[in-house]
Amino acid sequence: IRLDQPLFAFNPLKWDKLIEPLRYESSRREYAEEMEFIAREATSRFFAVMTSQINLQIATFNLANNDTIYKIEQGRYNIGTTSKDKLLQVELQLLRSRQDVAQARLAQETDRLRLRSFVGMNDTEQFELVLPEEIPQFEVSLNEALDRARANRSQFLDFERRRLEAESQVADAKGDRFQAMLTASYGLNNSGTALSEIYNDPLRQQRFNIGFNVPVVDWGRNKSRLRTAMANKEYTDYVIAQDEINFEQEILTQVRQFDMLRLQIEITKKSDEVAQERYNVAQNRYLIGKIDITNLNIALTEKDDAKRSYILALQSFWQAYYDLRRLTLYDFANKRPLYGNE
């Protein structure tokens, strides 16, 4: 029986015990991050349908209004209070409204099909989307967001894993520079004229040896390999430090943007209400002949733009909401992590 034990050699099992648990835990967290990415993508597709749905409502409303305006202009033209040019302008606007309705209906069907495909709904299931105007109320500080990200995100585990891998390469290179082997052996020895006599009262033979295997000349190979490993470790440390800075900057930007989007929703919602009221006033003034069709169209355009801006602000907020969850793996609304057994 012989036992050989290397001395000062690289021990891959020691490093695997440090690295592999990090790799496993990172994969668990990556799954949670992927789920939040899917939620974010679902939000984008939801608002694509929501936008096309609102556009169809706007186009349908404008078509009905333009049809009424065209009839009014026809009556005014017949009694000589408006010109042929204005009548043709209104008629052209009516034709464009019909085209807008057709295009909006097609866009809505296309977006609804994409949403169905993404969430796995069949063509027979009907649905109507409701605008998510109820915004969750919670505060997110930069320090808390950074702490949650450091504690939860797989990327920070990957930073530690990459550091350990670089250190293991240095340890491997150091282990190759000086090789020593400790050898121990135990055996039995005997002789005889017959095979059965060999196993009668054999002589014990014990040996303990220590040997060293040091290359006399390696032309600087091991020294160069160690220098390369140490240089790679320094480079890895630098890259990781930059990655940490970039990631923290991304979280900083996301938190600031999140607070700004709350304010943007309030502003665009108020603008939507004001633009709608202004259009109602302009429409009434047009009906009594106080303003012309051009000013009415300006009010109509501002009304439609304000509505779309409000929808876009809601979309930006909810996308940022799920981006923040993905970046920190934490649900700030319900105060709980998004992975693990908690």
Regions found by a protein language model. Give the residues of each.
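Amphipathic alpha-helical coiled-coil segments
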Residues: 34, 38-59, 75, 93, ...
